[in-house]
């Protein structure tokens, strides 16, 4: 059983939507599939000939041995929990963790945001329902903590950004969107704001509000208002 691998990064490459590293560990070359976020970080920083450590999930098949590497033990454990769900394969698991952080997935489970889960390639309506149902039982404690922190989750230090988020939240409330609907859209709005320039942040309220409304109105799985 391989728990982790620590060695020299030799090469990194992409095959379709899969991202790989080659690591030299004591003279052996390990080909490891990693999350897109880690791959891009290493590629952007042009890091080679440097030691890195990855938490490993080893999947043995009839015709191959597959290694999946993660930068944290939490990511690895979350990946394993996803694989334990019937009908969910390794590429679905990698797709979920490549697109969202663990806290974002837990928030989507807590708010039953099926559309967010369905945005991962390969996940349809039925699979999203199964993922939410089964992960909700597996991460009951984490969901309770998430719910307790939800009120403070989006208190941002930048006053201008915090005001934009608060204004959007108040506007959505005035338009009769439910608390759960608003809670489900705030991580997306916050992520969108993070990508804006300083000039864009001064003029982005209307665009972000429209983004939120379009997202919620097009989500047929949301609770009826």
Curated annotation (Swiss-Prot):
<feature type="region of interest" description="Domain II">
    <location>
        <begin position="72"/>
        <end position="150"/>
    </location>
</feature>
<dbReference type="GO" id="GO:0009378">
    <property type="term" value="F:four-way junction helicase activity"/>
</dbReference>
<dbReference type="Pfam" id="PF14520">
    <property type="entry name" value="HHH_5"/>
</dbReference>
<dbReference type="InterPro" id="IPR010994">
    <property type="entry name" value="RuvA_2-like"/>
</dbReference>
<comment type="subunit">
    <text>Homotetramer. Forms an RuvA(8)-RuvB(12)-Holliday junction (HJ) complex. HJ DNA is sandwiched between 2 RuvA tetramers; dsDNA enters through RuvA and exits via RuvB. An RuvB hexamer assembles on each DNA strand where it exits the tetramer. Each RuvB hexamer is contacted by two RuvA subunits (via domain III) on 2 adjacent RuvB subunits; this complex drives branch migration. In the full resolvosome a probable DNA-RuvA(4)-RuvB(12)-RuvC(2) complex forms which resolves the HJ.</text>
</comment>
<dbReference type="GO" id="GO:0006281">
    <property type="term" value="P:DNA repair"/>
</dbReference>
<keyword id="KW-0963">Cytoplasm</keyword>
<dbReference type="InterPro" id="IPR013849">
    <property type="entry name" value="DNA_helicase_Holl-junc_RuvA_I"/>
</dbReference>
<dbReference type="GO" id="GO:0005737">
    <property type="term" value="C:cytoplasm"/>
</dbReference>
<dbReference type="GO" id="GO:0006310">
    <property type="term" value="P:DNA recombination"/>
</dbReference>
<feature type="region of interest" description="Domain I">
    <location>
        <begin position="1"/>
        <end position="71"/>
    </location>
</feature>
<dbReference type="InterPro" id="IPR000085">
    <property type="entry name" value="RuvA"/>
</dbReference>
<dbReference type="GO" id="GO:0005524">
    <property type="term" value="F:ATP binding"/>
</dbReference>
<keyword id="KW-0227">DNA damage</keyword>
<dbReference type="InterPro" id="IPR012340">
    <property type="entry name" value="NA-bd_OB-fold"/>
</dbReference>
<dbReference type="GO" id="GO:0000400">
    <property type="term" value="F:four-way junction DNA binding"/>
</dbReference>
<dbReference type="Pfam" id="PF01330">
    <property type="entry name" value="RuvA_N"/>
</dbReference>
<comment type="function">
    <text>The RuvA-RuvB-RuvC complex processes Holliday junction (HJ) DNA during genetic recombination and DNA repair, while the RuvA-RuvB complex plays an important role in the rescue of blocked DNA replication forks via replication fork reversal (RFR). RuvA specifically binds to HJ cruciform DNA, conferring on it an open structure. The RuvB hexamer acts as an ATP-dependent pump, pulling dsDNA into and through the RuvAB complex. HJ branch migration allows RuvC to scan DNA until it finds its consensus sequence, where it cleaves and resolves the cruciform DNA.</text>
</comment>
<keyword id="KW-0233">DNA recombination</keyword>
<keyword id="KW-0238">DNA-binding</keyword>
<feature type="region of interest" description="Flexible linker">
    <location>
        <begin position="151"/>
        <end position="161"/>
    </location>
</feature>
<feature type="region of interest" description="Domain III">
    <location>
        <begin position="161"/>
        <end position="225"/>
    </location>
</feature>
<comment type="similarity">
    <text>Belongs to the RuvA family.</text>
</comment>
<dbReference type="GO" id="GO:0048476">
    <property type="term" value="C:Holliday junction resolvase complex"/>
</dbReference>
<protein>
    <recommendedName>
        <fullName>Holliday junction branch migration complex subunit RuvA</fullName>
    </recommendedName>
</protein>
<keyword id="KW-0234">DNA repair</keyword>
